[in-house]
Amino acid sequence: MRTRLSGGVAGEAGRPVPLCRFFAKYTDCVIVLIMGVVGAGKTTVGRLLAGQLGWEFVDADSFHSAANVEKIRLGIPLDDADRAPWLKAIREAINRWIAKKQNVVLACSALKRIYREALDVGVDVKLVYLKGTYEIIYQRLGLRQGHFATEKLLVSQFAILEEPEGGVVVDVRQTPEDIVEEIRRLLGLKPD
């Protein structure tokens, strides 16, 4: 096996494999990444799931810089350059959780495939996509209080959304309790 300086090992066809994926068979933890556009219910479902399992809940919004938070508050869509340090910080946190064998439910938009690749979704990170139409999510946002989401932000997120090819897909028209039950069933998750 050939070691690579980039932090991975050589995999199939000589492509680098991130160390976390290489060592995943030795880990005893699960990171559940709940993705979707703003208003899909990531935080509500994530907190409920984490509470039922006795796991930690983390909202990826907490990894944003103050400048990003201000842009979001003003309704200015973030670009890939804005998101790069945010994704790096999240991946570093995931690596720490894996090293500590800590089960975590992470709410993160992860709208593009390249973002999910940066987070190394796969072996150690289980993806759950909260899927809903623009109309359903827009209606939900109108009912929310105390959140910085705007219609402009929702439009921009749907514009860049690349639906995942793998993972668990859950319809957001269900109650949060039903969504959590479906996630637990599909991923075989039991409390610690």
Predicted features and spans:
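Small-molecule kinase domains that catalyze NTP-dependent phosphoryl transfer to phosphate-bearing small molecules
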Residues: 143-182
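Conserved lysine of the Walker
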Residues: 42
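Hydrophobic anchor at the beta1->P-loop junction of P-loop NTPases
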Residues: 34
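Conserved substrate/cofactor phosphate-moiety recognition/catalytic segment
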Residues: 47-90
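Loop/turn-to-beta-strand initiation segments
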Residues: 100-104, 126
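Conserved phosphate-donor/acceptor-positioning beta-strand/loop module used by diverse small-molecule
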Residues: 122-140
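The conserved Walker
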Residues: 38
